[in-house]
Amino acid sequence: TLNTLLLNCMFASGQLKEGEMYDVDFDHQFIETEKYDAKPTYKKFLGYRPGVAVIDDLIVGIENSDGNTNVRFHQKDTLKRFFERFEQNGLTINRFRADCGSCSEEIVEEIEKHSKSFYIRANRCSSLYNDIFALRGWKTEEINGIEFELNSILVEKWKGKAYRLVIQRQK
C-alpha cells in the first residue's frame, strides 16, 4: 500500500529508525474539494476527511473515509492498521495524542494495546462540572502561545477503568 511505501521511504532516508520510540499524533484533516465523489462534511463543505498519523513533522499514515460520516466511524480499524504497520517496521509508540474524536471506549482500547501512554482531548462534560469547579491548585502553562490553567482528576468512564482527565481552561 501507499502507507507501506511511505514508511519504507522514511526508513531508507534515515528519517525513522527501527527500534526507536516515537510520539504519534492523530487527527482528521478536512480537505475541501469540488471532485465528483466528495461528500458533505459537518464543517458544511464538500470534501474528504482522511485520518492522518504524524511523527514530528512526518506523515506516517493517511487513510481516507467518507466525508459525511462521524470521525469515529471505523477509526479503530484505521488506527489498528497504522499501529500494526508501525510494529511490523520495529517502531514503538511512546505517546499517542489525539483530539476528542478519538474519545470512545473501543478506540481507547485499541490505542492502549499499542502505546506506552496516550492523551486524548475529551469533550465538555456536564456530569463532571461540579467536580471540576471544586478543583484547587490549578497550574498555569503556555500552550502554542496561549496561556491556560491546567488540573487533573481521575475518572472512571468505561467498565471501572480509571483514567486521568487533564482539564484545561482559559482565563
Where are these regions (language model features)?
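Short, surface-exposed basic-aromatic patches at helix termini and helix-loop junctions that form
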Residues: 87-88, 108-117
